[in-house]
Amino acid sequence: MSLIDIQNLTIKNTSEKSLIKGIDLKIFSQQINALIGESGAGKSLIAKALLEYLPFDLSCTYDSYQFDGENVSRLSQYYGHTIGYISQNYAESFNDHTKLGKQLTAIYRKHYKGSKEEALSKVDKALSWVNLQSKDILNKYSFQLSGGQLERVYIASVLMLEPKLIIADEPVASLDALNGNQVMDLLQHIVLEHGQTLFIITHNLSHVLKYCQYIYVLKEGQIIERGNINHFKYEHLHPYTERLIKYRTQLKRDYYD
């Protein structure tokens, strides 16, 4: 069953050039779904279109758009508590003049009624999920953390709301290999144990082949291949997909040589 089903999604710029060319996309419920492709293929545009985050100079059309079996009219009603978004611009999510503890509890209480103590408990739990301790984070300002720490705080701010769907645009790109794998392990655990759904945009094919159940391959604004993980492991693939995987293998070989 699909949680999101969008048909004939097209994105154009002001010159009427199609950047995304009439794609059909389903995000399957309680699975880790992935969208892969080279830089500039349009992966982030698709994520922003699903969330209605596109810049004003781009237009988006589709034949139908359903979320959890219902036609979508105003997606903003789902933000936070039902749909979480992990973007690449994590540094812009927190201001520099308010301590992170206050900002995180405010985010939680914006979406859920509850006491400050309850919010702090949720914040503490989410920080532990991303291998951070509250005592090291809550009384600090964002500029006092490293980029990797701040990204993990940002991921925690999304996870603590326990959304039904998480759309993640390169969620571990700024993390080292150890913390990146820990975050992916956590996201996998959330999907498997808590029934949540993940749509991840990434160029990390190692993560895709290890964690994902359904995969889309995007090239120049078009989906040129799709299928479950067994298709990508065992079936004959599109030449473009073959090149992506071959390049990944070469990178790993160069790294270990």
From Swiss-Prot:
GO cellular component: plasma membrane
Domain ABC transporter: residue ranges: 4-245
Gene name in the database record: nikD
Induction annotation: Transcription is stable during the exponential phase and increases only in standard conditions in late exponential phase.
Listed InterPro entries: AAA+_ATPase, ABC_Ni/Peptide_Import, ABC_transporter-like_ATP-bd, P-loop_NTPase
Subcellular location: Cell membrane
Coiled-coil region(s): none
Quaternary structure note: The complex is composed of two ATP-binding proteins (NikD and NikE), two transmembrane proteins (NikB and NikC) and a solute-binding protein (NikA).
Protein name, per record: Nickel import system ATP-binding protein NikD
Function of the protein: Part of the ABC transporter complex NikABCDE (Opp2) involved in nickel import. Probably responsible for energy coupling to the transport system. Required for full urease activity and plays a significant role in the virulence of S.aureus during urinary tract infection (UTI).
Binding residues annotated for ATP, in chain numbering: G37, E38, S39, G40, A41, G42, K43, S44
The keyword RNA-binding belongs to this UniProt entry's keyword annotation: no
Predominant localisation class: membrane
One Pfam assignment: ABC_tran
Catalytic activity line of the entry: Ni(2+)(out) + ATP + H2O = Ni(2+)(in) + ADP + phosphate + H(+)
Record-linked SUPFAM superfamilies: P-loop containing nucleoside triphosphate hydrolases
UniProt family annotation: Belongs to the ABC transporter superfamily.
Enzyme class: translocase
Enzyme nomenclature, EC number: 7.2.2.11
SMART domains from the UniProt entry: AAA
GO molecular function: ABC-type nickel transporter activity; ATP binding; ATP hydrolysis activity; transmembrane transporter activity
